């Protein structure tokens, strides 16, 4: 293999791998231009490859997206959740650094809609269970406090114990 054939083979392998990812992958340069992106990235933003070679801002102009891009091109890791077409998309961006200079960024996009929905359901369920348990526990605690405080005649204690039991 010559050097050119080897480079071409490696490029094809990289394209094959990234095209088979569920996650969106975008590579940008230090000027925000899209150098490479897989089809999952285009699908998540609901665009076609017309943005290849253009600024990453052609995908989304939202303030939090712009801040994340500015942060990563400033040399820092950025992570946000975007709302895209009704879905929650986690954006994870890491700078590409050569020496001390940021040359661009690699952006990973993961659809976390179902994960966030499950977390919300779990939180809601926990809150409901907590509320449902607190109501009878408050009654039990109240009856026990009345008995302990000596406000109940000895012959009425079995009646209160029956209420607590029920």
Kindly give the residue locations of the regions a language model identified:
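Short, charged amphipathic alpha-helical "coupling" segments at sensory-output junctions
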Residues: 1-16, 114-118
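Conserved phosphoacceptor histidine of two-component systems
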Residues: 19, 127-131
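N-terminal capping loop/helix in small sensory signaling domains highlighted by a polar->aromatic N-x2-3-F motif
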Residues: 36-45
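Sensory-domain boundary/capping and coupling elements
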Residues: 116-127
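Short acidic helix/loop segment immediately C-terminal to the autophosphorylated histidine
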Residues: 148-155
């Amino acid at each position: 293999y010559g050097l050119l054939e080897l480079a071409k083979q490696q490029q094809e392998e990289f394209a094959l791998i990234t095209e088979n990812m569920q996650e969106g992958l975008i590579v940008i340069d230090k000027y925000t231009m899209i150098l490479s992106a897989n089809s999952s990235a285009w699908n998540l933003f609901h665009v076609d490859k017309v943005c290849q070679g253009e600024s990453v801002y052609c995908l989304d102009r939202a303030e939090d997206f712009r801040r994340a891009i500015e942060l990563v091109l400033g040399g820092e890791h950025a992570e946000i959740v975007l709302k895209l077409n009704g879905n929650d998309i986690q954006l994870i961006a890491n700078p590409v650094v050569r020496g001390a200079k940021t040359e661009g960024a690699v952006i990973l996009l993961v659809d976390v809609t179902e994960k966030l929905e499950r977390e919300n359901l779990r939180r809601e369920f926990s809150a409901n269970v907590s509320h449902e348990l607190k109501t009878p526990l408050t009654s039990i605690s109240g009856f026990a406090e009345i008995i302990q405080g000596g406000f109940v005649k000895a012959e009425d204690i079995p009646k209160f114990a029956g209420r607590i039991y029920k």
